[in-house]
UniProtKB/Swiss-Prot annotation:
GO terms for molecular function: symporter activity. This is Neutral amino acid uniporter 4. It comes from Mus musculus. Highly expressed in hippocampus, hypothalamus and piriform cortex (at protein level). Expressed in epithelial cells and both inhibitory and excitatory neurons. The lineage of its organism: Eukaryota, Metazoa, Chordata, Craniata, Vertebrata. It is a multi-pass membrane protein. Belongs to the amino acid/polyamine transporter 2 family. Uniporter that mediates the transport of neutral amino acids like L-tryptophan, proline and alanine. The transport activity is sodium ions-independent, electroneutral and therefore functions via facilitated diffusion. The modification N-acetylmethionine is found at residue 1.
Amino acid sequence: MEAPAPAETAGCEELDMDVMRPLINEQNFDGSSDEEQEQTLVPIQKHYQLDGQHGISFLQTLVHLLKGNIGTGLLGLPLAIKNAGIVLGPISLVFIGIISVHCMHILVRCSHFLCQRFKKSTLGYSDTVSFAMEASPWSCLQRQAAWGRQVVDFFLVITQLGFCSVYIVFLAENVKQVHEGFLGSTPIVSNGSDLSHACERRSVDLRVYMLCFLPLIILLVFIRELKNLFVLSFLANISMAASLVIIYQYVVRNMPDPHNLPIVAGWKKYPLFFGTAVFAFEGIGVVLPLENQMRESKRFPQALNIGMAIVTVLYISLATLGYMCFRDEIKGSITLNLPQDMWLYQSVKILYSFGIFVTYSIQFYVPAEIIIPGVTARLHAKWKRICEFGIRSLLVSITRAGAILIPRLDIVISFVGAVSSSTLALILPPLVEILTFSKDHYNIWMILKNISIAFTGVVGFLLGTYVTVEEIIYPTTAVVAGTSQSPFLNVNSTCITSGL
């Protein structure tokens, strides 16, 4: 992906907070109508417009869509292909990608319809679900419409904090490999004792690296305004783009004979594929905020189709080529398969880790701004800032605890994807369309289509959760990504790698 010009990129990054804000403030929407907003309401076939001073451009929207969908999930897709098969995997990725994009379009269409029906200028995800329940023909749902908003907010918080836990595991595993690769290339002065030599080379537990990142991440999330992260965010985007280019050239240049790869993997592993794939495609949370902020919102479907087409091609190509290159040795992140004795490929892990480190603060923004205002609302002004920093530190510690409990990158990605991403991306949007249009625009084919999509999401949710939990409790492998996955630190060990 070609990097945008610095001036326009600056505009993109400075708008990050404004783009994310509708995701935060929607639960405080008072439901009152505005006369000026009411006068600007137009038929459903048309779209509202923002002036050039406040809206974001088509290119900025496209960049934000790419940023919202490209992360650690992309690097975990080669292992997902292994869990599905070299033929079934790519086909399933196309299928899940098409359904995910369709659900994004569903959400935008329902938001437009409900905006006009309830005379609102814009609606976010939570309010779209709430007003869809209010517009439904069933009185029991109408009375519980407020619960729709709370359910979406809950899954948004769980999803974003889950992303943050994934990032901590990713950072720890990649930095661990770089550190051990550096130690492995450094001559060691030995007294001739094999035991001493073994102790020098013994690996540090993955959780120690997680602990080292904790204060750095806490300091990062103390930056309350995303626009203040512009320079870091811009450098992070460049770093991740450069890393992907290097990864592509490696897998293409080192491609073995692709024969003898399983066309279809065992069915017990397919739920792990589903969780990882849905995790990767779960960018639905940024769709309505972006559409609401776009200057020419009538062009948003075009931006969505172009952006997600790029994302899907990127996903399928890297997933397939990565699995064909590393075969059964593929790990939870393809970066962990790159050579440890060449600094070009070690730099990929450093660069991508830097990008993920900065992205942590962006993903953390949503749950922090949903939780913190409700907790600090009744506090005295002088205590609010202290309490806010305490809550931010606590939330970061919670994400680290989640990473410690599930220190396997592949499993934590599949678990978050199955539990929360499938709910937001596949289950809720088709149900929202049924609730929104069943009263005035009843269509049996629309009902059947949406029930099928929601059923797929529910099955993936149940099977994916079951298989990942089973894998957590009864792991099939004792060593993942080259690190011991024992449930606790070996505090009795007397041999710890130096240089940490």
